[in-house]
Design a protein with these regions (language model features):
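Conserved glycine-rich beta-strand-loop-beta hairpin in the small C-terminal domain of fold type I
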Residues: 332, 348-359, 370-384
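Conserved core segment of the aminotransferase class I/II
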Residues: 26, 270-349, 359-361, 444
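PLP-dependent enzyme catalytic core of the Aspartate aminotransferase-like
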Residues: 208, 389-391, 395, 399-408, ...
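N-terminal small-domain helix-loop-helix segment of the aminotransferase-like
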Residues: 45-148, 155, 322, 334-337, ...
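Conserved PLP-anchoring active-site segment centered on the Schiff-base-forming lysine
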Residues: 159-181
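Active-site phosphate-binding strand-loop segment of PLP-dependent enzymes
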Residues: 189, 194-265
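Helix C-cap/helix->beta junction micro-motif
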Residues: 76, 184, 244-245, 275, ...
Length: 453
């Protein structure tokens, strides 16, 4: 073997192939000498760099192909009305001034790493908030701060799931949940929310989909994309299913203050102490602070059997070092200050007026129906398939974008079961919202005529 090494090394040196020389030296040092050639770095033989197989089942249509088409149109000089993302600041919904001022005052202390779970003061503020929500037994150590709730959703799934594990996720859902389950190696199993029952979870359907592989139930309440708000009796039925089958309940409550018509949100984690709950929330929606990336995750309920899972969460929190410090500094002031969201959702408030306007304009269109949202920032209207025979709702959305320069998200992007819905954000001012809905109505009128039977 030594003779072979000298021979091939000499040939490589003579040829000036120093890459092969270095490679053979490594092989010899490791006791694995073999002839090998370096893969060329230029030319037609370059191996394509492909994404991980872990991403094969991951999809996030809110920022999907239609958005790419929209960006291209904007680059070409077209002005669009974007009703695809609940990004409040771009529509003139600014964060409270005291939050911004407090972040600025604390910026000198934001240069270093914080504790991996977050600074003490904002976590204590979150603990007090859980007490206001009547979630019992939460300690500082049960609270994790993150770069938005989205980061913590992914972390929670990574810490829980093995290949083949199943998680019950609503249909329609906020698609990050489905994507996070898939990325972690799990299988998202979608339980139906019933449009005829104001988008309430179908408990019988949920029950029928529990198997020995089921690990958890995801509850998005208030719901994105439907705007549904779940009453106590529904929440108690979900808890009972989790209790019977030993499942974790993940509660996404990011819209828990964006409530209309005097509705009140009840946290599912406040209704039992013998089930493990993971509750996620943040500043993005209630405090119009999407870009601050300030969210939190709270572990509550029966934690005795979850020590290993919690250890995994601690490990993952440490691996990402910490959440951004400026966003953490915003939390205490936000939770303890004046709740200006109330001014936006009460009678005369901008969000309430725009919800009512969007609802009327959409439901006045022939063949369009919609459950009026009780919460959140979205409409999820249905298009009568007899009038709008849509086979591919992504193509439908792209056609609307091309013809009327209005950007929406198709219903199947939220894992809905049929191509007969879309989601609309009602954040633009009344004039722009009226313009957008008028364009949608014009497009649908043409679509009906083209597909008339």
């Amino acid at each position: 073997m030594g003779h072979d090494y000298k021979l091939f090394a000499a040939q490589a040196i003579f040829a000036g192939d120093w890459c092969k020389v270095a490679q053979m030296r490594r092989f010899r040092q490791n006791g694995i000498f073999r002839t090998a050639t370096c893969r060329p770095t230029t030319g037609d033989n370059v191996r394509p760099i492909r994404k991980s197989n872990k991403l094969d089942d991951v999809c996030y249509e809110i920022r999907g192909p239609a958005l790419e088409k929209a960006r291209q149109m904007e680059d070409d000089g077209h002005k669009l009305i974007k009703l695809n993302i609940g990004n409040l600041a771009v529509f003139g919904f600014d964060p409270p001034d005291e939050i911004m001022q407090d972040m600025i005052r604390n910026m000198h202390g934001a240069a270093g790493y914080t504790d991996s779970k977050g600074l003490f003061a904002p976590r204590k503020a979150v603990m007090h908030y859980t007490q206001q929500k009547k979630i019992a037994g939460v300690r500082i150590d049960d609270i994790y701060l993150g770069n938005g709730a989205s980061e913590l959703i992914v972390m929670a799934m990574q810490g829980l799931l093995n290949n083949g594990d199943e998680v019950l996720v609503p249909a329609p859902d906020y698609p990050l949940w489905t994507a996070a389950v898939s990325l972690a190696g799990g299988s998202p199993i979608h339980y139906v929310c019933d449009e005829q029952a104001d988008w309430m979870p179908d408990i019988a359907d949920m029950r029928s989909k529990i198997t020995p592989n089921t690990r958890a139930i995801v509850v998005i309440n208030p719901n994105n994309p439907t705007g549904a708000l779940y009453p106590r009796e529904i929440l108690l039925e979900i808890i009972e299913l989790a209790r019977q089958h030993g499942l974790i309940i993940y509660a996404d409550e990011i819209y828990d203050k964006v409530l209309y018509d005097g509705n009140v949100h009840e946290s599912i984690a406040s209704l039992a102490d013998d089930v493990l709950f993971v509750t996620l929330n943040g500043l993005s929606k209630n405090y119009r602070s999407c870009g601050y990336r300030a969210g939190w995750m709270v572990i509550s309920g029966d934690k005795r059997h979850a020590k290993d899972y919690i250890e995994g969460l601690n490990m993952l929190a440490s691996m990402r070092l910490c959440a951004n410090a400026p966003g953490q500094f915003a939390i205490q002031t936000a939770l303890g200050g004046y709740q200006s969201i109330d001014d936006l959702v009460r009678p005369g408030g901008r969000l309430l007026k725009q919800r009512d306007l969007a609802y009327k304009l959409l439901t006045d269109i022939p063949g369009v129906s919609c459950v009026k949202p009780k919460a959140a920032l979205y409409m999820f209207p249905r298009l009568d398939p007899a009038m709008y025979p849509i086979a591919d709702d992504q193509q439908f959305i792209c056609e609307l974008l091309a013809e009327e320069k209005v950007l929406l998200v198709q219903g199947t992007g939220f894992n809905w079961i049929a191509p007969d819905h879309f989601r609309l954000v009602f954040l633009p001012n009344s004039d722009d919202l009226t313009d957008a809905c008028g364009r949608i109505a014009r497009f649908l009128d043409g679509y009906r005529r083209r597909h008339a039977r």
